[in-house]
């Protein structure tokens, strides 16, 4: 889906979804508000936008049209779902497969300030998005205000391990312990 790792910009003015809306649903209208801010981010040299909460733009919610996950040390951290974050099947699949292969997963709020702090400490190892079309989209850098932060590749990438496991299940090359595949017959 994406031919390269993404560079993303953390949005601190515009919002994709607001409390009381339908941001939790996979609805086309939820992404119309993304066009203009994404165009602005692209003009700055970024591929996608990291969406933050509409109240104070501090809690990270999603990236582009995907769920977002962070590897902090050896833990996979992803934002809690809410009325502004889609509790989608791709997100659920990534969480389950990560647990299946022995990765510790934590669902909780993560703020922009925490992300930058973890980056500065060297404990932010990976960022990736997950969605239906992309499965997993690795993120190689993120921008916030005037700063840009580069994420170095890691040899034991959680994103690669999770994607490989999901694709093998999809292609019937691995067991499907969760009953996700359905045989289609004529």
Task: Describe the function of each predicted region.
Residues 1-186:
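Helix-start/capping segments and mature chain N-termini
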């Amino acid at each position: 889906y994406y031919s390269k790792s993404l560079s993303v910009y953390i949005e601190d003015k515009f919002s994709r979804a607001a409390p009381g809306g339908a941001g939790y649903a996979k609805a086309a209208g939820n992404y119309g508000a993304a066009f203009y801010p994404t165009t602005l981010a692209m003009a700055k040299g970024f591929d996608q936008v990291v969406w933050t909460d509409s109240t104070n733009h501090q809690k990270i919610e999603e990236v582009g049209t995907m769920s977002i996950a962070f590897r902090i040390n050896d833990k996979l951290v992803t934002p809690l779902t809410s009325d502004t974050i889609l509790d989608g099947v791709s997100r659920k699949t990534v969480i389950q497969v990560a647990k299946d292969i022995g990765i510790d997963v934590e669902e909780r709020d993560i703020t922009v300030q925490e992300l930058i702090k973890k980056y500065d400490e060297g404990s932010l190892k990976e960022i990736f998005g997950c969605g239906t079309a992309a499965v997993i989209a690795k993120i190689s850098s993120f921008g916030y205000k005037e700063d840009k932060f580069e994420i170095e590749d890691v040899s034991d990438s959680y994103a690669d391990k999770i994607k490989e496991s999901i694709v093998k299940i999809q292609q019937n090359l691995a067991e499907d312990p969760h009953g996700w595949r359905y045989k289609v017959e004529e």
